[in-house]
Amino acid sequence: MSDALKPLIGLAADRALTRTEAETAFAALFNGEATPSQMGGLLMALRTRGETVDEYAAAAAVMRAKCNKVSAPADAMDIVGTGGDGKGTLNISTATAFVVAGAGVPVAKHGNRNLSSKSGAADALTEMGIQVMVGPKVVEKSLKEAGICFMMAPMHHPAIAHVMPTRQELGTRTIFNILGPLTNPADVKRQLTGAFSRDLIRPMAETLKQLGSEVAWLVHGSDGTDELTITGVSWVAGLSEDGNISEFEVHPEEAGLPEHPFEAIVGGTPAENAAAFRALLEGTPSAYRDAVLLNSAAALKVAGVVSSLKEGAERAAESIDSGAALGKVTAVARITSEAS
């Protein structure tokens, strides 16, 4: 039992914790000092009252401090979603990561098993021949040689094991449902991050600012997806290099792309998703391709290599049609397979 945590649970139910108080509380969780009852008490107190930016930042900072880190270039970025949107779409952020890497931007992607898709990023990558359960040394080799890596959350955040049984028993969303995108082990400074709720995009942008990010787009689709949607409008909270956070909308037409019905981007089994993924990277036209082009355009804008979404979509299409994006998949599969 953690004596330090006990009074903080009571405080958390009544008021927002300060950054220091929240760091003390989450250190107790991640150090394995808290009992399951204390963990559950803290998580539910925060959820019931509603977490604050300081509490998000504190939890993420403690997780980052305890993670198995990865060395990455200064211009590397992450492309990730919270998951948990329940929409079962194709693996859009995963495909986007390879397209962006094919366009020359280093991508250090943080991910896990399926949450919102019928198969998550790790599931689709496994079907594509990529070994995901590899450690930091292999990840760094992949990033250095292929320009992209996939960091499996359990391989980099062992401290989370202390909390997993309690999370599973609670069976409801907690602060941990948004911590993945906030705790990239490569400490990237640029992010395209999807959220399962529009209400999260502003506080998540403010949290990333506190944690030292330079440029980030936090996005949510009007169809409920945790990415820029090809089915209509998306909402964005954008952190710019001057530290300002602005909120705006993105429409597919801004990238020169048509809208598609939601049914056209619904995924299936890991094998089905991997087949769609490969067809996309081989240049097959589809709603899936357009969804990936839209998100890739945004990522390239966040990376600072294009000035408009239309230019970004054109650059992304070139990455696909030249075979560069598929080449990145092949390279990562080779590097991770040689290491396993």
Curated annotation (Swiss-Prot):
Mg(2+) 1 binds at S93, E227. One of its GO terms (cellular component) is cytosol. Pathway: Amino-acid biosynthesis; L-tryptophan biosynthesis; L-tryptophan from chorismate: step 2/5. GO terms for molecular function: anthranilate phosphoribosyltransferase activity; magnesium ion binding. Signal peptide: none annotated. It catalyses: N-(5-phospho-beta-D-ribosyl)anthranilate + diphosphate = 5-phospho-alpha-D-ribose 1-diphosphate + anthranilate. Keywords: Amino-acid biosynthesis, Aromatic amino acid biosynthesis, Glycosyltransferase, Magnesium, Metal-binding, Transferase, Tryptophan biosynthesis. 5-phospho-alpha-D-ribose 1-diphosphate binds at residues 81, 84-85, 89, 91-94, 109-117, 121. One of its GO terms (biological process) is L-tryptophan biosynthetic process. Pfam families: Glycos_trans_3N, Glycos_transf_3. Its cofactor is Mg(2+). Its EC number is 2.4.2.18. The keyword Transferase applies. Anthranilate 2 binds at R167. Binds 2 magnesium ions per monomer. Anthranilate 1 binds at G81, N112. Mg(2+) 2 binds at D226, E227. Homodimer. Belongs to the anthranilate phosphoribosyltransferase family. Catalyzes the transfer of the phosphoribosyl group of 5-phosphorylribose-1-pyrophosphate (PRPP) to anthranilate to yield N-(5'-phosphoribosyl)-anthranilate (PRA). This is Anthranilate phosphoribosyltransferase. It comes from Ruegeria sp. (strain TM1040).
